């Protein structure tokens, strides 16, 4: 039987990995074979799960193996931990990503899933795969489980602050969008972590039509457990909450939500009255520091420069030969392919390329020398 796949999304720093880790541990205590998949470039999802030991990431291992022209194997990137008192080992993977400022995190997620799918991840003898996903960025890579229906179910994690709820709302909207174009991921509901009793996240959930699955109160002892790379479910009051949620998931007691998310104005009005007035525009005078009565000649001059460049280019094009003009306009302005231009003008593709090349060289000369 294929593994049950659940993507857990939330704003960075709100306890998303804490939630995922303790849910993984709870499933393992229920004799389920669990794989926790860290899908954040920070690659810290499984740190507590593995007692503080960092896992080599798929991104790094793939780069090293690729440099040596060697294939990536399961044992290179999948790790297990046997824990006393747990009937099943817990498995972990960190996708990782590029170093800060050196690449695209979303692209790293896409590439990581490509590697895992080639290794047959969805055919492994695993009961549940929990995917711990960053939800802060509007990036197609981080929406991979939703876009490709790699996760059957989605759980949102939030606190009672506006920014974390806003992130949850964005993910809800994204999941709804992908469902409208054939996506199969179902939204199970919302977990409120570090609940302060203010009820803000609950008001949002009610307005958006999202089920509140669990409320985890702020607990200093739970924080200390996590900070020392241990499980908060060792605390009875925390364990009880996670056990109930895990049991509800396993026994299919949760009805998926049909929520589409709130639009922006509907969202912000949850936090207070907001005026319908349009924002007040700034003026060029105040930004350029002009005194009242000065002309706006800088703005006009800047626009004139842009206009004159376009006009100059058009004049240069008109100086090309008729054949060069025809090919250049079709390729550069009408965005036709070389093969299409060749067919329309009854020329060989090589002839079209030569005309295009000569036209570009001539335009460069005319524009900068004219």
What residue ranges belong to the model's regions?
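Conserved catalytic-core segment of NTP-binding enzymes
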Residues: 118-128, 133-224
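A short pre-motif secondary-structure segment
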Residues: 327-331
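DNA-recognition helix of helix-turn-helix
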Residues: 343-369
